[in-house]
UniProtKB/Swiss-Prot annotation:
Source organism (scientific name): Mycoplasma capricolum subsp. capricolum (strain California kid / ATCC 27343 / NCTC 10154)
BP-aspect Gene Ontology terms: translation
Superkingdom to which the source organism belongs: Bacteria
Family: Belongs to the universal ribosomal protein uL24 family.
A cellular-component GO term for this protein: ribosome
Sorted UniProt keywords: Ribonucleoprotein, Ribosomal protein, RNA-binding, rRNA-binding
Job of this protein: One of two assembly initiator proteins, it binds directly to the 5'-end of the 23S rRNA, where it nucleates assembly of the 50S subunit.
Oligomer and partners: Part of the 50S ribosomal subunit.
PANTHER family reported in the protein's UniProt record: MITOCHONDRIAL RIBOSOMAL PROTEIN L24
Example of a GO MF term: rRNA binding
The protein's name in its UniProt record: Large ribosomal subunit protein uL24
Length: 108
């Protein structure tokens, strides 16, 4: 399994599936299954009432997308998606957008 170059907080665009074209920051990553959750992308799920939660019905639940179905949005040109590359700047390894050659700010 390859190491993911997309990190939590990166702004991504969905490139495949029913949510294709939607943009948002990554809220969580499951590394072993390679799933990501993107802010604002939800699925509707039918929930039956239980003893703890007496309210049933249709609820919006954050959708989990496979990491191959999202691509990093270019920080310089917001219309395009890009791949992630690495460069050594001042002795530190930093992530760069391959299309625009700009440094990607890491959200912490």
């Amino acid at each position: 399994m390859a190491k993911s170059r997309i990190l939590k907080g990166d702004v991504v665009k969905v490139i495949a599936g029913s949510h294709k074209g939607q943009i948002g920051p990554i809220t969580s990553i499951t590394k072993d299954k390679q799933w990501v959750s993107v802010q604002g992308i939800t699925v509707k799920k039918h929930v039956k009432p239980t003893n703890e939660d007496s309210e049933g019905g249709i609820k919006d639940i954050p959708a989990k997308l496979h990491i191959s179905n999202v691509a990093l949005q270019d920080p310089k040109n917001k219309d395009q998606v890009t791949k992630v590359g690495f460069e050594i700047i001042d002795g530190k390894k930093v992530r760069i957008a391959r299309k625009s050659k700009t440094q990607i700010k890491t959200a912490k």
